[in-house]
Amino acid sequence: MLTDSALLTLLQWVSPALPIGGFNYSEGLETLIAQGQITSAAALQDWLGFELAFGSAQWETAVMARVYRAIAKGDFEAVHQWNAWLSAARESAELRAQNWQMGTALINLVAALDRLPPALQTGQPYPWNVSVAFCIAANLADIPLETALLGYLHSWATTLINAAVKLIPLGQTAGQLLLRQLQPQIQQTVQQSLNVTDDNLESCTLGLALASMQHETLYCRLFRS
């Protein structure tokens, strides 16, 4: 059950105003827009919808479900293992740096506002991925797993849509309409992620990987990924 306190905390963690630097990143969108591959709200919806169904958003939420359950059981070794798995799964230096930077900022914020379990304060061989840090924050606030995943994907979509509003550009209303239209796919991705087995953790992110790698050499960049 989502209590009022947990709801307010979730709204804080998914707010675009959260000081973890999400506004600095486009996750390859800047490359695709510069190359003329995404030039409209419809094209952006197709791209984000694919990421939700088959791409990084799909497998990341499946891993987040495992992390959340491991924290709930006190299996902090599994938390570290899945964080390392996510770090290894990043397909470019920019995507890995993005997740580590945002994850470090978020875990520091969580430590300042809440009390981290001692087992999560030390022994981490890699910086925290932002999705793992989000799971830790959600678990400490007693936010239910499914609700936490919905909030995370809503925040992810909001960040990328806001980047596209600047880059394409799109109108603010068009951006909000797109966010509303993605709601069914966000819900479907969360439901699927709750039941994915370890053997079926997979994605098809060739376009994202190439766009992210090519972003490093763009002549002019507004975003860090």
Curated annotation (Swiss-Prot):
The keyword Cell division does not apply. Signal peptide: none annotated. Keywords: Chaperone, Cytoplasm, Nickel insertion. The keyword Cytoplasm applies. InterPro entries: UreF (IPR002639), UreF_sf (IPR038277). GO terms for cellular component: cytoplasm. One of its GO terms (molecular function) is nickel cation binding. It is found in: Cytoplasm. It comes from the Bacteria. Pfam families: UreF. Gene3D superfamilies: Urease accessory protein UreF (1.10.4190.10). Required for maturation of urease via the functional incorporation of the urease nickel metallocenter. Belongs to the UreF family. UreD, UreF and UreG form a complex that acts as a GTP-hydrolysis-dependent molecular chaperone, activating the urease apoprotein by helping to assemble the nickel containing metallocenter of UreC. The UreE protein probably delivers the nickel. This is Urease accessory protein UreF. It comes from Thermosynechococcus vestitus (strain NIES-2133 / IAM M-273 / BP-1). The lineage of its organism: Bacteria, Bacillati, Cyanobacteriota, Cyanophyceae, Acaryochloridales.
